[in-house]
Amino acid sequence: MSDPFANPDQTLDTQGLRCPEPVMMVRKTVRHMQDGETLLIIADDPATTRDIPGFCRFMEHTLVAQAVDALPYQYLLKKGL
């Protein structure tokens, strides 16, 4: 089974940042991406377990994968649906 986090188009490390900074950085990064590109988000803020999936739903992006069982958390977002 392949690692869904292995080859993202971009990576954003938000470790050490607290809500709302991680989501603000994700939004800024995604704005400059092309539809279909992927972004690996690395975070350690517990609020991201709620905020990143919510951002994807609200902004109509795809949350391809998430790993939130241990720190750092990882989220793979694909721009667009």
Swiss-Prot record:
<dbReference type="GO" id="GO:0005737">
    <property type="term" value="C:cytoplasm"/>
</dbReference>
<comment type="function">
    <text>Sulfur carrier protein involved in sulfur trafficking in the cell. Part of a sulfur-relay system required for 2-thiolation during synthesis of 2-thiouridine of the modified wobble base 5-methylaminomethyl-2-thiouridine (mnm(5)s(2)U) in tRNA. Interacts with IscS and stimulates its cysteine desulfurase activity. Accepts an activated sulfur from IscS, which is then transferred to TusD, and thus determines the direction of sulfur flow from IscS to 2-thiouridine formation. Also appears to be involved in sulfur transfer for the biosynthesis of molybdopterin.</text>
</comment>
<dbReference type="InterPro" id="IPR022931">
    <property type="entry name" value="Sulphur_carrier_TusA"/>
</dbReference>
<comment type="subunit">
    <text>Interacts with IscS.</text>
</comment>
<comment type="similarity">
    <text>Belongs to the sulfur carrier protein TusA family.</text>
</comment>
<feature type="active site" description="Cysteine persulfide intermediate">
    <location>
        <position position="19"/>
    </location>
</feature>
<protein>
    <recommendedName>
        <fullName>Sulfur carrier protein TusA</fullName>
    </recommendedName>
</protein>
<dbReference type="GO" id="GO:0002143">
    <property type="term" value="P:tRNA wobble position uridine thiolation"/>
</dbReference>
<dbReference type="InterPro" id="IPR001455">
    <property type="entry name" value="TusA-like"/>
</dbReference>
<keyword id="KW-0819">tRNA processing</keyword>
<dbReference type="GO" id="GO:0097163">
    <property type="term" value="F:sulfur carrier activity"/>
</dbReference>
<dbReference type="Pfam" id="PF01206">
    <property type="entry name" value="TusA"/>
</dbReference>
<comment type="pathway">
    <text>tRNA modification.</text>
</comment>
<dbReference type="InterPro" id="IPR036868">
    <property type="entry name" value="TusA-like_sf"/>
</dbReference>
<keyword id="KW-0963">Cytoplasm</keyword>
